[in-house]
Amino acid sequence: MTTTLEEQLSDKLQMMDETTDKVQGSSKQKDDSSIAASSDAKTASPSSSDSSTKVAAPESEFYNKAQKYWSEVPATVNGMLGGLGYISAIDIQGSNVFLREIRVPGNRLALDCGAGIGRVTRNLLIPRFSCVDLVEQDPAFADKAREYCTSEDGSRGKVGQIYNVGLQKFTPTQQYDLVWTQWVLGHLTDRDLVSFFRRIKQGLAPGAFLCLKENVSSSKKTVEDRNDSSVTRPLDSYEHFLKEAGFRIVRKVKQQNFPKGLFPVYMIACKPVSKE
């Protein structure tokens, strides 16, 4: 993964009490391999709300600890979602509605960042695109993803490259119609997050979208999870970092119908300021 996670949501969802949003020991979601800055990842650069990520440990330790955490997680949907595998269908439904609303102009090639075992690739991206590339840092997840995403006849031949690298080191070499990151950006330092956004900008086809789906803190503070070495940022931090990297936000929607007690989850679609 890099991810983040996808994170992912990459996107690893864990119950937390709404009243403990300020408590730094609280858990958080991650998805499809929110693996330390691999396929679901995290970043630097102070935001206007003074919510910049404060990584107590050295940067290498921050990433290594997250990588170790995800290496011990089962390569299953339930593992990717922190024991909350039952929310996968609701999550995919919300993402499908979001993509219909923004009307991605092309259907040739998509990129799943922090892909984990490919939950988002299989259920959201493969039905929409001719080919999907994945970025996933964890080797076991990457191996499982190719199997999981090609187990149905309609998906054969639709999985392209699987980049086994962290998002903090990933540079796209293709032009994508859509780049999707989910539950992984919390595994990047602020500095690496902005740098990742800037590199992704160079890998977007004309009119293409970068989409984020991430947990956000309910307060203006960044919440640190030392267990998996990640952070949950306020929504305005993502807005600030996207602007700093040269993106404009086209649409922003809160995911509905998730169980109570989880962090709010937002989807953000954006385009480079210099591209239409």
Swiss-Prot record:
Enzyme class: transferase
Any single GO CC term annotated in Swiss-Prot or TrEMBL for this entry: cytoplasm
Domain of life where this protein originates: Eukaryota
Residue ranges of coiled coil: none
The protein's name in its UniProt record: Alpha N-terminal protein methyltransferase 1
Start-end of Low complexity biased regions: 34-57
Organism encoding this protein: Drosophila melanogaster
Reactions accelerated catalytically: N-terminal L-alanyl-L-prolyl-L-lysyl-[protein] + 3 S-adenosyl-L-methionine = N-terminal N,N,N-trimethyl-L-alanyl-L-prolyl-L-lysyl-[protein] + 3 S-adenosyl-L-homocysteine + 3 H(+); N-terminal L-seryl-L-prolyl-L-lysyl-[protein] + 3 S-adenosyl-L-methionine = N-terminal N,N,N-trimethyl-L-seryl-L-prolyl-L-lysyl-[protein] + 3 S-adenosyl-L-homocysteine + 3 H(+); N-terminal L-prolyl-L-prolyl-L-lysyl-[protein] + 2 S-adenosyl-L-methionine = N-terminal N,N-dimethyl-L-prolyl-L-prolyl-L-lysyl-[protein] + 2 S-adenosyl-L-homocysteine + 2 H(+)
Binding sites annotated in the UniProt record for S-adenosyl-L-methionine: G114, R119, E136, Q137, D138, L167, Q168, Q182
Annotated stretches, region: Disordered: 1-57
Keyword set, alphabetical order: Methyltransferase, S-adenosyl-L-methionine, Transferase
GO molecular function, one term: N-terminal protein N-methyltransferase activity
Example GO BP: methylation
Family: Belongs to the methyltransferase superfamily. NTM1 family.
Function description: Alpha-N-methyltransferase that methylates the N-terminus of target proteins containing the N-terminal motif [Ala/Pro/Ser]-Pro-Lys when the initiator Met is cleaved. Specifically catalyzes mono-, di- or tri-methylation of exposed alpha-amino group of Ala or Ser residue in the [Ala/Ser]-Pro-Lys motif and mono- or di-methylation of Pro in the Pro-Pro-Lys motif.
EC assignment: 2.1.1.244
